[in-house]
Amino acid sequence: MKNKIKSTALATLLTGTALLTGTLPTGSEAAESPFAVAMEKMEIDGLNIAYREAGDPDNPTVLLLHGFPTSSHMFRELIPELAAKYHVIAPDYPGFGASDMPDAASYDYSFANAADIVTQLIDAKDVDDYAVYLMDYGAPVGYRMFAEHPERVTGFIIQNGNAYEEGLRDFWDPI
């Protein structure tokens, strides 16, 4: 038992030292490896929006939209697996994860606003088209993005996604 405690303490010390001395990749350094996941922030509409990104931007992009009450953290094991073949972006909506949480009295926490924020993020990342994985709360966000720009979405992966009539456009009427 003493050896296990010593081993754990040593591993913790070495990891902490590596983080403090900058010998572990972070930020843009981490993004250079297709398997490393960079946690970044971008200012959009006055809010700091957090997102995880990995993989080669020249590869097809997969956008991962989280549910409620989660964040991009839920994809932490999936992102490195996808990054071998895809460029992966997983944002945190306003009020979720590491993104800013504006006061509800002054900010409209709607699916439309979340979709707009994510669209601005992928525009700033120069992503022209993407496949989207969505679930739960991410479904109405992703559906709104598709309704606005169907030409950009190359495919859907839907897990337990809800489709609400509220907010859907005339685009869906023929279906």
Task: Describe these PLM feature segments.
Residues 2-61, 84-86, 127-128:
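Alpha/beta-hydrolase fold catalytic core
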Residues 30, 171-175:
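Short, intrinsically disordered, charge-balanced linker/junction segments flanking boundaries
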Residues 40, 64, 89-90, 133, ...:
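Conserved Rossmann-like nucleotide-binding pocket used by diverse enzymes
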Residues 44-45, 52-54, 90-135:
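Active-site loop/oxyanion-hole signature of alpha/beta-hydrolase fold enzymes
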Residues 47, 53-101:
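Conserved HGGG/HGGXW glycine-rich cap/lid loop of the alpha/beta-hydrolase fold
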Residues 76, 119, 143-147:
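Short, hydrophobic alpha-helix immediately C-terminal to the catalytic nucleophile
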Residues 85, 127-169:
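Conserved hydrolase catalytic core segment
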Residues 100-103, 167-172:
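Short aromatic-enriched loop/helix-cap "lid" or pocket-rim segments at secondary-structure transitions
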